[in-house]
Amino acid sequence: MTINNINSFIDHTQLKPEATPGQIEKLCQEAIDYKFKAVCVNPVHVNLAANLLKDSEVEIASVVGFPLGASATDVKEYEAKKAVEHGASEIDMVINIGLLKNEQDMEVIEDISSVVNTVPVGIVVKVIIETCLLSDEEKIKACELAKRAGAHYVKTSTGFSSSGATVEDVKIMKKTVGEKLGVKASGGIRDLETAQKMIEAGATRIGASKSVEIVKSQSN
C-alpha cells in the first residue's frame, strides 16, 4: 500500500535542546516548500515559527511538559497558554507517567483536561503517552484517559526516551481511541517505508525530523 501525499501527515520536527534560530528558520521554510501539515518546536521557538509561517497553511505545534511530563499541572497550563499566545495552534503535551503507573486515573485526567480547557476552542491537544515506558495495559489506559479528558490526539513518544513509535503500539492506540481521536506516531521514523507502515497501522499524523528525506524518497 502506497500512501499518497504523505507530506500532509507530517509534523516536521525540531526539538533538540541545541536548536538555533537558524535551524528553526530552515525547518519552517522546508515546511512551506514541502507542504507539511505542521512544524513541532520547543516553546521558546513558537514566536519565531509563527512569524515565519504567518502567510502559510502550516500549523504550529508546541510541546508542553516536555520531555518528562513531570511538571506540575498548573505549569503545563501556563506553558500551553503562553505557547498559544505566541502563535501555537497545536499543543503536544506529555502525560504524567508516574501518576498513570500509580493508577491515579482522576489525577491523570485532570492533568490533561486542565490543558485542554486552558487553551481556546480549536486548539488541537495531543497527549504523548511515552509508549516505551508502558505495558500494553497501561497504553490502553493512557489512551482511554486522554479520550475522557477531551484530548484530540494520542501520541506515541517524545523521541527522548528509550525508544520511539512501533507499529504494534500504533495499532493498540488506534483500536483504543477509534475514530474519535487521531493517533500521532513519532520517534525513530526516518524513512518512507516506516512512515507508511505507521499510517497503515492507524496513524493519522507522523512526527519526524527526517521529513524531507521521507518525502523526497516518495517522489523518486
Swiss-Prot record:
<dbReference type="GO" id="GO:0009264">
    <property type="term" value="P:deoxyribonucleotide catabolic process"/>
</dbReference>
<dbReference type="InterPro" id="IPR028581">
    <property type="entry name" value="DeoC_typeI"/>
</dbReference>
<comment type="function">
    <text>Catalyzes a reversible aldol reaction between acetaldehyde and D-glyceraldehyde 3-phosphate to generate 2-deoxy-D-ribose 5-phosphate.</text>
</comment>
<dbReference type="InterPro" id="IPR002915">
    <property type="entry name" value="DeoC/FbaB/LacD_aldolase"/>
</dbReference>
<dbReference type="Pfam" id="PF01791">
    <property type="entry name" value="DeoC"/>
</dbReference>
<keyword id="KW-0704">Schiff base</keyword>
<keyword id="KW-0456">Lyase</keyword>
<keyword id="KW-0963">Cytoplasm</keyword>
<dbReference type="GO" id="GO:0004139">
    <property type="term" value="F:deoxyribose-phosphate aldolase activity"/>
</dbReference>
<dbReference type="InterPro" id="IPR011343">
    <property type="entry name" value="DeoC"/>
</dbReference>
<dbReference type="GO" id="GO:0005737">
    <property type="term" value="C:cytoplasm"/>
</dbReference>
<feature type="active site" description="Proton donor/acceptor">
    <location>
        <position position="92"/>
    </location>
</feature>
<protein>
    <recommendedName>
        <fullName>Deoxyribose-phosphate aldolase</fullName>
        <ecNumber>4.1.2.4</ecNumber>
    </recommendedName>
</protein>
<comment type="pathway">
    <text>Carbohydrate degradation; 2-deoxy-D-ribose 1-phosphate degradation; D-glyceraldehyde 3-phosphate and acetaldehyde from 2-deoxy-alpha-D-ribose 1-phosphate: step 2/2.</text>
</comment>
<feature type="active site" description="Schiff-base intermediate with acetaldehyde">
    <location>
        <position position="155"/>
    </location>
</feature>
<feature type="active site" description="Proton donor/acceptor">
    <location>
        <position position="184"/>
    </location>
</feature>
<dbReference type="InterPro" id="IPR013785">
    <property type="entry name" value="Aldolase_TIM"/>
</dbReference>
<comment type="similarity">
    <text>Belongs to the DeoC/FbaB aldolase family. DeoC type 1 subfamily.</text>
</comment>
<dbReference type="GO" id="GO:0006018">
    <property type="term" value="P:2-deoxyribose 1-phosphate catabolic process"/>
</dbReference>
<dbReference type="GO" id="GO:0016052">
    <property type="term" value="P:carbohydrate catabolic process"/>
</dbReference>
